[in-house]
Amino acid sequence: MILLCVISRTVLLNIRKRDIRFFTYFEFLLIAALHYGILILFLPVTALLLRTKEQSWYTIFQAVTEPVVLSAYKVTFLTAALAAVINAFLGLILAWILVRYRFPGKNFLDAAVDLPFALPTSVGGLTLMTVYSDKGWMGPICSWLGIKIAFSRLGVLIAMMFVSLPFIVRTIQPVLQSMEEETEEAAWCIGASPWTTFWNVLFPPMISPLLTGTALGFSRAIGEYGSIVLVASNIPMKDLVVSVLIFQRLEQYDYKGATAIASVVLLVSFAILLIINYIYLKRKSLTR
């Protein structure tokens, strides 16, 4: 509450210093929006960290360094990173196709990209199970090829790719749409090949949004629960991820352990987002 009061007073002073004629209702709406953002975003995070701080450092260290927990961290972060890298490549190609080409069903495909946003995660998991389980559409074919997707780490990877793909596509699409075709034509006129034009002219402006989308997709994959709990076997030391482990600890009434594990994930995700934002702002300042 003290933070809210300080921010509100600072905003009011800044507004009145700039223009005394600002309407009172504008000040009210601005302060209300700030309060809303703080209450929705910062208050739950602060509460989680403070609840973790109530425990001793030794208890926290014990909770987050159990072999099962370390294995869950490893599976979660490595699989989410792999999903983010694959989606960065495939999402870039998909965004390029949606922007640069016209074909039957393009609007349907463009709308389908947002499907993971609209679907409940449990429905997404059930959809993946319908396709990749042993009795699904692709399951028997994959089993015949010796590939097991459902109830394996590969299933976790596909679920993470499914929920995080829209972040890549939707962050790159506006950049591609804003690029003028005359720039490419000028590069071709001076003898540049299509591949050289892509790497030297088109790709540099896409680096920042690509990194941003990849980071958002990575963070989204880390927090995925609904689809993974259906696709994976959730066996410790095999394909158990952190989000499912936290829920299991809550079912066992181990609230302190669940809080400690969740705090580590929160801090790691926040640190990654800060690093990506720093890189984005650094590149933006250099291009000015």
Curated annotation (Swiss-Prot):
Protein name per the record: Probable sulfate transport system permease protein cysT
Function: Part of the ABC transporter complex cysAWTP (TC 3.A.1.6.1) involved in sulfate/thiosulfate import. Probably responsible for the translocation of the substrate across the membrane.
GO CC annotation: chloroplast membrane; plasma membrane
Keyword Cell membrane among UniProt keywords: no
Family according to the record: Belongs to the binding-protein-dependent transport system permease family. CysTW subfamily.
PANTHER family tied to this protein: SULFATE TRANSPORT SYSTEM PERMEASE PROTEIN, SULFATE TRANSPORT SYSTEM PERMEASE PROTEIN CYST
UniProt keyword annotations, A-Z: Chloroplast, Membrane, Plastid, Sulfate transport, Transmembrane, Transmembrane helix, Transport
Main location class: plastid
Native species: Zygnema circumcarinatum
Xref: SUPFAM superfamilies: MetI-like
